[in-house]
UniProtKB/Swiss-Prot annotation:
Keywords: Aminoacyl-tRNA synthetase, ATP-binding, Cytoplasm, Ligase, Metal-binding, Nucleotide-binding, Protein biosynthesis, Zinc. PANTHER family: CYSTEINE--TRNA LIGASE, CYTOPLASMIC, CYSTEINYL-TRNA SYNTHETASE. CDD domains: CysRS_core. SMART domains: DALR_2. Zn(2+) binds at residues 28, 208, 233, 237. GO terms for cellular component: cytoplasm. A motif ('KMSKS' region) lies at residues 265-269. InterPro entries: Cys-tRNA-ligase (IPR015803), Cys-tRNA-synt_Ia_DALR (IPR015273), Cys-tRNA/MSH_ligase (IPR024909), Rossmann-like_a/b/a_fold (IPR014729), tRNA-synt_1_cat_dom (IPR032678), tRNAsynth_Ia_anticodon-bd (IPR009080). Disulfide bonds: none annotated. It comes from Pyrococcus furiosus (strain ATCC 43587 / DSM 3638 / JCM 8422 / Vc1). This is Cysteine--tRNA ligase.
């Protein structure tokens, strides 16, 4: 039974989607004015794994993720670079999508942009005005928070606390400090659109309410994002959406923990961030995924080079296991009998699979699931060391388990993809080069033999000489 931690209820709940077999999921996308960093990667890798696991369990998942392509930050950056705000946003949307593809994050089904939904936003604001939740001030349209009695149910924030010590700044047209903008009237030199309230642009919070509801309906299953969005963004989304629709809007709210740097949140404002592109120059994409998955998605994740190196080493351990299996399968025994060693190893594989699912069913606990993965890897390596003639059936059982891990975690994908004809052909070529090198060594033409070894190593193939015999395995760089 899958349980998820719901930020709305502050507890783990049995996951029951609104429609059996189908999950509708919205994840807040980036405001596109700069290069995405590891904090973004953490959130989107986490929700990618959540989506993958739901699909693995048989759910049909419809996933929507927006792009905020008009915002104060975009306008400010465009002024600094001399670009048109729309062009700047499109440039960083392209960069974001390239980075996600590199990290093997599956694309969302729909990527709505704010600027393509201005008419929908205006219509939504109009409904809030008609229902008495919104009013027009001198500089825009505002949502009147006190009209929504359940305000604060997600974050625990109380209206009276927002009012303490707060004041309406001169020039602001809102009635109360806690009210928030739905529509901002145009300022000189800023992008603007026509509306019944004059030219202007949307407020931030209204955008996600409109785009999620347009594609997923007035009620859907999962709304996700980083912890920093709980208040005010998601709190305000709930207020305006449930005020408009008159019923519960989202069933489960999921939030990822912060990436930390020396005890502080990684953020652009603090300048302590590392971009995804910088990381990809030093580490394979799977290493970054593995680094993220070693912690539960709700826990803080401390960024250190040592942590990434540790993730790389652990990932290499698993790749070594997979390669050991691959090598052993070339000479494995097809047998209808098992001995004590086979039964013992099979039990560890079976128990590892159970523990893996148990961990993932416990609010997508990837950290615990990985422990099960390493238990199986250790058992297989021990089996290969102790077995006189490894049994093919045991090795296939192990590969079946690792393929599940691959599907859910988004790692080893190239490895399993290469089980096709392409992999077989590449293996034949490698075997041929190994035989050629063997002959060169016999003829004492060591310079050429060493050249083959080094060239194969550059391609991720490591040769190991044991006397007159040579074995090979794949490595990650």
């Amino acid at each position: 039974m899958l349980k998820v931690y719901n930020t709305l209820t502050k507890q783990k709940e049995e996951f029951k989607p609104l429609r059996e077999g189908e999950v509708k999921m919205y994840v807040c996308g980036p405001t596109v004015y700069d290069y995405p960093h590891l904090g973004h990667a953490r959130t989107y890798i986490a929700f990618d794994v959540i989506r993958r696991y739901l699909e693995h369990k048989g759910y049909t998942v419809l996933m929507v993720m927006n792009f905020t392509d008009i915002d104060d930050k975009i306008i400010k950056r465009a002024r600094e670079t001399g670009e048109d705000p729309k062009e700047l946003a499109e440039r960083f949307i392209k960069i974001f999508l390239e980075d996600m593809e590199a990290l093997k994050v599956k694309p969302a089904d729909i990527y709505p942009r704010v600027t393509d939904h201005i008419d929908d936003i205006i219509e939504f604001i109009g409904k809030l005005k008609e229902k008495g939740y919104a009013y027009e001030g001198s500089d825009g349209i505002y949502f009147e928070v006190k009209k929504f009695p359940e305000y604060g149910k997600l974050s625990g924030v109380k209206i009276e606390d927002l009012q303490k010590g707060a004041r309406v700044e001169p020039g602001e047209g809102k009635k109360n400090p806690e009210d928030f903008a739905l529509w901002k009237k145009a300022k000189p030199g800023e992008p603007k659109w026509d509306s019944p309230w004059g030219e202007g642009r949307p407020g931030w919070h209204i955008e996600c309410s409109v785009m999620s509801s347009k594609y997923l309906g007035e009620s859907f299953d999962i709304h996700g994002g980083g912890n920093d969005l709980i208040f005010p963004h998601h709190e305000n989304e709930i207020a305006q959406s449930e005020a408009c629709f008159g019923h519960e809007w989202v069933k489960y709210w999921l939030h990822t923990g912060f990436v930390m740097v020396k005890g502080e949140k990684m953020s652009k404002s603090l300048g302590n961030f590392v971009t995804i592109r910088e990381l990809l120059k030093r580490y394979e994409p799977e290493v970054i995924r593995f680094f993220v998955l070693q912690k539960h998605y709700r826990s803080p994740l401390e960024y250190t080079e040592e942590g990434l190196q540790h993730a790389k080493n652990n990932l290499q351990r698993l790749y070594n296991t997979l390669e050991n299996i691959r090598v052993a399968l070339r000479n494995a025994e097809i047998s209808y009998t098992w001995g004590e060693l086979e039964f013992k190893t099979y039990e560890i594989i079976r128990e590892g699979k159970r523990k893996f699912y148990e961990a993932m069913d416990d609010d997508f606990n990837t950290a615990e699931a990985l422990k099960a993965v390493f238990e199986v890897a250790n058992a297989i390596n021990k089996y290969l060391t102790e077995a006189n003639k490894p049994k093919e059936s045991i090795l296939r059982k192990a590969l079946e388990f690792f393929k599940i891990v691959s599907e859910v975690f988004g790692v080893f994908e190239d490895y399993f993809r290469e089980e096709t004809k392409e992999r077989e052909e590449s293996e034949k070529l490698i075997e041929l080069l190994v035989e050629v090198r063997k002959q060169l060594r016999k003829e004492k033409r060591y310079e050429l033999a060493d050249m083959i070894r080094e060239e194969l190593k550059k391609l991720g193939i490591q040769l190991e000489d044991r006397g007159s015999e040579t074995t090979w395995k794949r490595i990650i760089t």
